[in-house]
């Protein structure tokens, strides 16, 4: 990973100009795909331009908006937001119960200054990993699978999940705020919509995840 824990060559952060700034979940993160076959590496090769990949597995729309807020610099030309319809709204429903993330939605001046706190973030992550390693030998296989699927780290304080009846309106607000933020930064926002296979294979057209 790079200096901030994302899947990039570290020197990408030192480029005078960032042509592509990617946010998303596991598709962008590069889960199960090694460099140079992940999306950002392929884009970097085909375009011969600088690409920053800020995707992380498990991220939802609110975390992705918070990522833009925390890491977007003036030298970024294009922000590419990759949305996966299979579970991103479900992730947003969970994220809407996290006070620390809701602050980004309700307070345009809120920041955790994450770029300046990487040493602190690293320590938190190391402590959590060491703590979980001690527990692993006591976990049954099903518990281990659940742990791996649920485990998400980004140095943020997590609160209990609660359902949000307004998560679809939150999604609209997130997109509007993201557009305004990128315009203010003189960057251009591109929203890439990844459809779910089951929507067409199984005819799940009325699933709420597919009807925003």
Regions found by a protein language model. Give the residues of each.
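Membrane/wall-proximal cationic-aromatic binding patches
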Residues: 1-46, 154
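N-terminal secretory targeting modules
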Residues: 1-19, 74-75, 88-93, 97-98, ...
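Short, flexible loop segments at the rims of nucleotide/cofactor-binding pockets, characterized by
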Residues: 1-3, 55-59, 167-168
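A structural signal for isolated positions on well-ordered beta-strands in alpha/beta enzyme cores
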Residues: 21, 52, 80, 190-192
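Structural preference for long, well-ordered alpha-helical segments in enzyme cores
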Residues: 23, 67, 175-178
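Conserved SGNH/GDSL esterase-like catalytic core that processes O-acyl groups on lipids
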Residues: 29-107
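Serine-dependent acyl-ester chemistry module
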Residues: 84-212
């Amino acid at each position: 990973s790079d200096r901030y824990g994302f899947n990039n060559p570290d020197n990408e952060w030192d480029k005078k100009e960032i042509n592509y700034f990617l946010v998303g979940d596991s598709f962008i993160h590069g889960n199960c795909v090694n460099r140079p076959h992940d999306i950002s590496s392929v884009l970097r090769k085909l375009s011969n331009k600088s690409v920053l990949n800020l995707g992380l597995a498990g991220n939802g729309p609110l975390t992705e908006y918070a990522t833009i807020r925390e890491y977007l610099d003036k030298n970024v030309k294009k922000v590419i937001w990759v949305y996966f319809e299979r579970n991103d709204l479900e992730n947003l429903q969970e994220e809407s119960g996290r006070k620390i993330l809701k602050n980004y939605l309700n307070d345009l001046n809120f920041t955790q200054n994450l770029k300046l706190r990487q040493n602190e973030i690293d320590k938190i992550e190391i402590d959590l990993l060491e703590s979980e390693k001690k527990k692993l030998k006591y976990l049954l296989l099903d518990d281990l699978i659940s742990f791996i699927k649920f485990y998400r780290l980004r140095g943020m304080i997590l609160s209990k999940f609660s359902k949000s009846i307004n998560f679809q309106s939150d999604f609209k607000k997130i997109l509007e705020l993201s557009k305004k933020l990128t315009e203010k930064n003189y960057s251009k926002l591109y929203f890439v919509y990844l459809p779910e296979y089951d929507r067409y294979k199984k005819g799940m057209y009325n699933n709420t995840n597919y009807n925003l």
